[in-house]
Amino acid sequence: MADFLTLSPEVNSARMYAGGGPGSLSAAAAAWDELAAELWLAAASFESVCSGLADRWWQGPSSRMMAAQAARHTGWLAAAATQAEGAASQAQTMALAYEAAFAATVHPALVAANRALVAWLAGSNVFGQNTPAIAAAEAIYEQMWAQDVVAMLNYHAVASAVGARLRPWQQLLHELPRRLGGEHSDSTNTELANPSSTTTRITVPGASPVHAATLLPFIGRLLAARYAELNTAIGTNWFPGTTPEVVSYPATIGVLSGSLGAVDANQSIAIGQQMLHNEILAATASGQPVTVAGLSMGSMVIDRELAYLAIDPNAPPSSALTFVELAGPERGLAQTYLPVGTTIPIAGYTVGNAPESQYNTSVVYSQYDIWADPPDRPWNLLAGANALMGAAYFHDLTAYAAPQQGIEIAAVTSSLGGTTTTYMIPSPTLPLLLPLKQIGVPDWIVGGLNNVLKPLVDAGYSQYAPTAGPYFSHGNLVW
């Protein structure tokens, strides 16, 4: 995987565009789905015939023995059908990951055109007149490099996660009798669908920096590497001892991501929700509990998936899944200042509602992070400036939050039975003052300033100063 960081866009783009495409993966997914349907039908038919025989025509000890063996065979068929569904889901996940990576990869023709332009400019740069144009072209090339690196890293992460879960079909069938209580199975075999007892942690990343590299082109590759590292860390301390599997979706917000060709927020979230759903189905097929952690924009993907699972008759049981949303901007900034259903055209984003869910969910935010904990009295400019600094210091770091760091703010049980518990990671020192600490200003001075400024900042939040005047909630001014 590491070679993606050092390979030029000429290589990474050529690799992606030279591939065979997702057609074979989609065909495999369809074939596995068809096999699963046939196995489920066979199981139902066999069970119906045996039940009818035992209920009407065949009674006694031999009938009961037959029924026990028939139930084992029916269970074998059902378990095999579940495995076939899991294989279909994995193939579809890979197809979606390829499509996302392909869309995010720079076309080789654009890379070649950029290199040709630089060569021409350099060749005619007799008096240095082309130096600014060369620098601009090189900056674009650095962006291409960063864009390809992120695309390939995310694609590799999904492929690695899928590959880790795949096992030989013959081995799975051999282990089915033991799973179903058979007597002639090898007790040393591993579990059917999970070779490790480690719980899976599906991570859903926040917005990608792939296009933002135009702002800082020469560190684009470092941004890509930092983003990939952060994505595997999301929820690592909230669910310790779990194995991360990253959902590789576009994670862009239209032109605000730094490119006219970037996918808008609604499309990114929709793609992410579909990919997350496939990951959940594949992971829960093992019978092991699964955790899901989303950071920032990833928390919005989780909310869309929770809403879908709430109406899905085939959703996994409530005991199979646990969610955590970290530094979510929708439950924070968006739902503070905008009514649900409001669309922001420049981002292609429509504000969603917090869904009812059958699953237990933790909502975690860092105090004074403007994305997840904005001041609901925006006319308090000091609170606003402090919250901007809070985002810079705390937003991404919320990915590493642990339960013992949080203060429980609220716990609400929905009509579907799931409890949503909100936690705040407190910041004793105002983010506005953290730069002073970093440059070595004595603690007693910083502490004194904190004591003076904190009440003024907290007046910008109705939760800290409920009697300090009106405030915004869901886009409405509350008096």
From Swiss-Prot:
Organism: Mycobacterium tuberculosis (strain ATCC 25618 / H37Rv)
Gene that produces this protein: PPE63
InterPro entries in the record: AB_hydrolase_fold, PE-PPE_C, PPE_dom, PPE_sf
Domain of life: Bacteria
Cysteines joined through disulfide linkages: none
UniProt-listed Pfam families: PE-PPE (PF08237), PPE (PF00823)
Ranges of compositional bias, category Polar residues: 187-202
Residue ranges of the region described as Disordered: 180-203
Taxonomic lineage: Bacteria, Bacillati, Actinomycetota, Actinomycetes, Mycobacteriales
Any single Gene Ontology cellular-component annotation: plasma membrane
Protein name: Uncharacterized PPE family protein PPE63
Family of the protein in this entry: Belongs to the mycobacterial PPE family.
Biological processes per GO annotation: response to host immune response
Domain PE-PPE, first and last residues per copy: 240-462
